[in-house]
C-alpha cells in the first residue's frame, strides 16, 4: 500500500479526506478520489510477493549455495531495473533494441513476473537446506537474525517514521483539488469564494487529509507485513531449535 494500491483505490469513508469533504458539503466525494499517488497513468496495483516470501528470500541469500543463488539474484535485479522503464531510460532503450523479444512486451512491468517466480524460489532453496539439516544451528540463527533484521527493520522504519519521509503526493493533490474546487465554485456561481481564496484554502486542507490517509494506509500495511515476517521468522527459529519436527 506504499503508493496507495491501484489506480481505482479510493479513500475510506471513515478517513480524514472524507471528513474534510463532508464538512464542505461534498459527502461521498472521497470515494471518487484515487488514493494512488504514483506516476503511472493507470496501474492495477503493485506486483504482489508477500512479506514472508521476501523474508525467506533474504534468508536464501544468506544460506543458499552460491552457484544456485547468484543467477536468481541477478535475474531479480535485472528485471526490476527493466521494470523502471523511463525512470532508467538508457537501460530500457538498450534492452528494447538488443534484448530478443523485449520489444514485444506490452508494458515494462511485465518483467516483474520473473521476480514473482524468483523470490519464492530463493526462499525455497533456504527451506530445502534447512529441512535437510545441512546448516549448523549457530549459522542458521545468525542468518535468521540478519534476514529478519533487514526485512523487519525496513517495515518497522516505514511504520514508525514513514509518514515523515515522504509527501504522499500532497503537492500534486493540492494542485488537482484547487482546480476542482475552482471549477465547482464557477459552475455554481460562487465567484466570491474564489476571490476570497477559498479554492486554495479548501484544496490545501483536502490535500493534507489525502496525504494523511495515504500515510495511514502505508503504516497499516507496514505493521501487517512486520507481523507476517515475525511469524515466519518464529517458525524458522522453532524449527532450528528442534521445537518443530521437520515432518510437521
Show where each model-derived region lies:
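Contiguous transmembrane helix-bundle modules in multi-pass membrane proteins
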Residues: 64-248
